[in-house]
Regions:
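RNA pseudouridine synthases
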Residues: 1-355
């Protein structure tokens, strides 16, 4: 698990601090400094002067490198199609990283208990604060990658591969739907509603729902995608079982914004809550969250469903999103004929339900 990085020469320079560099393809002709400026102008919302200053500092720091990791100069000339790389400081560098709990270790892979404070992979403003970077630093292995993803606020079982030669065999388990995923969730909606009866403990559900996600949208949409559109879509299916009900908290007056499921934000009003066991038969962005919200059981602490909260809404309230990847079950690639079952400890919010 502590194996050091051994990248093949000529493919990609080593990561720095667990963070991979950004790759570019040279169009040829101009100096490398001008090429990088032009390519960053298409990617960053900065002025020409700011980008020029950024590029100058990157060259001075040795952050622009060849595939072998050799620092390149501003006046370097590359042939069309040649690759070069840029090491960028993470926007959240210096953030405290929790120690990851290893739940299972197999041939070329581990399963960790993902905390809610980390994204799965480095992306956007969550770079250092990602499981991949945290694991690379904790185990001293820059080859670690995630075989699948969990939403940033979701906790629980996450499978990581440790070596490129094992990566495909684990990712294919997910692609071929050979991994059984079981989640715990806590939702509102236990009181029922005008159009439905209150769910009973032990009652099972088979939720089937078309959904799609438009580019740039934070939340998925329910229904068929617009005709002719090229958005990601799915005919989702989720099996649900009501494991228990939580004691009804003291009633309070409902505030403006009724429907808010996060106790730390305006509009939250207590009602009977449910503890669910969920098994997704398909895999789509926010599938479990969007499905339960659509059918009247929004997850406690969800900032997106059924309503999208403002970007500056506080996240440090308790409980946060009540969704936990409780268990992974899959055939062990390292031991043919053997099934691996990995279970993550139940979170605090899942305790206390009456069954």
């Amino acid at each position: 698990m502590g194996r050091r990085s051994k990248r093949r020469a000529g493919t990609r320079p080593p990561a720095r601090g667990g963070i991979d560099p950004v790759g570019f393809v040279s169009p040829g002709q101009e100096t490398l400094e001008r090429q990088l400026q032009a390519q960053l102008e298409r990617k960053l919302s900065l002025s020409t002067a700011e980008i020029a200053d950024f590029v100058a500092k990157a060259f001075a720091a040795g952050d622009v490198v060849s595939p072998l990791g050799i620092a390149l100069s501003p006046d370097s000339k590359l042939l069309e199609g040649q690759r070069y790389y840029l090491h960028r400081a993470a926007p959240d560098e210096g953030a405290a990283l929790p120690k990851l709990q290893v739940l299972w270790e197999g041939e070329g892979a581990i399963v960790v208990n993902k905390p809610a404070s980390l994204a799965t992979i480095p992306r956007g403003s969550w770079v250092t604060r990602s499981v991949v970077v945290a694991a690379r630093r904790q185990f001293g292995n820059d080859e670690i990658t995630a075989a699948h993803r969990l939403d940033r606020l979701t906790t629980g079982c996450l499978l990581l591969t440790l070596d490129p030669k094992y990566r495909a065999r684990y990712q294919q388990l997910f692609d071929r739907r050979q991994v059984k995923k079981t989640y715990l969730a806590r939702s509102r909606g236990g009181d029922g509603g005008e159009e439905r009866e209150a769910p009973q403990v032990g009652e099972s559900f088979d939720f089937q729902l078309p959904m799609f996600k438009e580019t740039g949208s934070l939340a998925v949409s329910i229904g068929a995608p617009p005709i002719g559109s090229k958005v990601a879509s799915c005919e989702s299916r989720t099996r649900g079982l009501v494991l228990g009900k939580f004691p009804l908290p003291e009633k309070t007056e409902k505030a403006e914004g009724e429907g808010n499921t996060n106790p730390g934000n305006p509009g939250y009003a207590p009602e009977e809550e449910l503890l669910w066991q969920l098994e997704p038969e398909s895999g789509f962005t926010h599938q479990l969250r969007a499905t339960l919200a659509h059918f009247g059981y929004p997850l406690v602490g969800d900032p997106l469903y059924p309503i999208v909260l403002p970007a500056d809404a506080p996240e440090n309230v308790e409980p946060q999103l009540c969704l936990h990847a409780q268990e992974l079950q899959f055939p062990d690639p390292g031991n043919p004929g053997t099934t691996v079952t990995v279970t993550a400890p139940a979170p605090t919010w899942a305790k206390g339900a009456l069954n």
